[in-house]
Amino acid sequence: KPVFLLDEPEAFLHPPYARRMGEILGKNFIENESLNNVFISTHSSFLLQGLISSCSEELTIVRLNRDGDMRCAKVLSNKEILSLIDRSDFSAEYLDALFSSEAVLVEGPRDAAVYRKLISEFDTNYSGLFVSVNGKPGFESIKKFYDSAGIRCKVITDFDLLDNNDIFKRVSNLFITTNDKRNEIREVRNSLERFYRELEGCPGGQRDKMPEIVKSHYKHQVYENLPDDLGVSVEEMLRLLAREGLVVLSSGELKSLFEAYGVEYVHGSNKWLTNAFSYMANHSCDELRDIPAVAILLQAFIPEEQRG
């Protein structure tokens, strides 16, 4: 039986039509008994969605990757891809990362816009794809999927990742693999919670629900009132995590990133986004690099010799 080769059939098609083409191709190839195998190359997550919807049981997805002179092929799990597509918050972005050199998971679209702009200020050639996972609980499963697909994956998250011990443990374990380092960062995280609780007169353990007044300390001005030794430990923990690819914003929430530099902390406001872009556009790389939270973020993205 013949083998059929098809190169980028989605070329020049809008996304909805690329998806429809995938559905039609999948259905027709399955019904065509004269064919032995069909090989389709694509750069379209929409064509891929169409193929998956029409012939998932007959489909084998292979991701090709080139790193310098090295080339490798990775067979992806259909079960994992179907699980990803079945998520209630599924976006084509999740599959777009299959065609990218690197995925950067962030909490929401605003985060993606700001961090993309910020990193491009230091590296205009950065080609990683910023993927919004709609909140911290999405980090773990999507990071695991990209790991299994052979895609380099980083995470940028607000500081309040640390206010939930369980989520912090599961996400940080994806980046920190040695028990001694895991125990080290967990002890720092727990010491920080104890301090915030004592500061507000709300004693309790990790299993007790954290009062909102305690949670507020994770939102912005997170170093305020911290003892020097605890502040140093938190800083060292954040730098360690960043070097491994997990960036925890040391200023608190995204909206606190430029707060100390005149960009007012405003929760859920488009005005903040406009002001943040204006701030980045009007300040040099050296000035941006002097912001502590930015300096930590750069450890995950910019080689040390280029950081200045």
Pin down the residues of each PLM region.
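Switch/communication elements of ASCE P-loop NTPase nucleotide-binding domains
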Residues: K1-D96, Q299-R307
